[in-house]
């Protein structure tokens, strides 16, 4: 009877219920904590497993990247070997006339760059002999290095322009004739060293002009003296001979000194080597009027308009452009160093080709 009385008291029943609730919550919390600890341990174990796998994958990736670097190095080595072997293959086709490509060159900021670019063009041309003539008292190791690396059959010469005929850095290109001594040095070399040659073509190619490989095929067609259009020259998009219906030359479209016997650029013609060998006095001169270097040379070879051969699909295509590398804008101090060829740091010297 006593317990029933106690239970009849509502507050006692509520207290007992509350105690039971808190006890249940305590057991639940303890179980939950134990469960979380187990989950944490499981998760930590999983993380450790994944970390080990990640380390393993990272090691594999590193090994594969290292192998890739090795393979890339091997590919480059093989490419180099292939290029070297190809360069050593015979470049001479006896049925194809040789081109004697004469390039006068002088020291300037872009000389090394221009000759490097030109060497890559000429390296694609078989049966070509590159005659490079420096405007200097001695041969430059930098230019010799370009010629050696090009694997092009070549002759390296030098001829100094007289001081009274040399232009200052800021002089316009047309102030004085350029390449006179250098072209003559090359012509004399041809006359002395190639006197027994029966076939071949002589061409004067500036080191900063642009050449389509097709122009070399046109040169090989020359029987006497060939002529073709030249782009970006003489204040025009194209300078070209104008032909009659029968294919002979009527006149030229030049606007600068059109009265010249041959109002064309040096890049516009090539001559058979037999003409050079049989006309030893056909040389260039400082004593001709400005713009008459080409005309005087061709006339001294006995060339006339009527016996020139229009090439490049009867002068309807342009395969050579008289491009010019722009002079860099330099300070007076830099121009002075360039003129004296001194005072360069090692990187500048390498860029300019004075690092020997």
Curated annotation (Swiss-Prot):
Catalysed reaction equations from the record: 3-O-(beta-D-galactosyl-(1->3)-beta-D-galactosyl-(1->4)-beta-D-xylosyl)-L-seryl-[protein] + UDP-alpha-D-glucuronate = 3-O-(beta-D-GlcA-(1->3)-beta-D-Gal-(1->3)-beta-D-Gal-(1->4)-beta-D-Xyl)-L-seryl-[protein] + UDP + H(+)
Phenotypic consequence of gene deletion: F1 adults accumulate eggs in the uterus. Embryos are predominantly arrested at the bean/comma embryonic stage.
Membrane topology: Single-pass type II membrane protein
InterPro entries linked: Glyco_trans_43 (IPR005027), Nucleotide-diphossugar_trans (IPR029044)
Mutation effect (residue 226 to E): In n2843; embryos are predominantly arrested at the bean/comma embryonic stage
Pfam families: Glyco_transf_43
Catalytic site: 294
GO molecular function, one term: metal ion binding
Protein's recorded name: Galactosylgalactosylxylosylprotein 3-beta-glucuronosyltransferase sqv-8
Annotated organism of origin: Caenorhabditis elegans
Gene of this entry: sqv-8
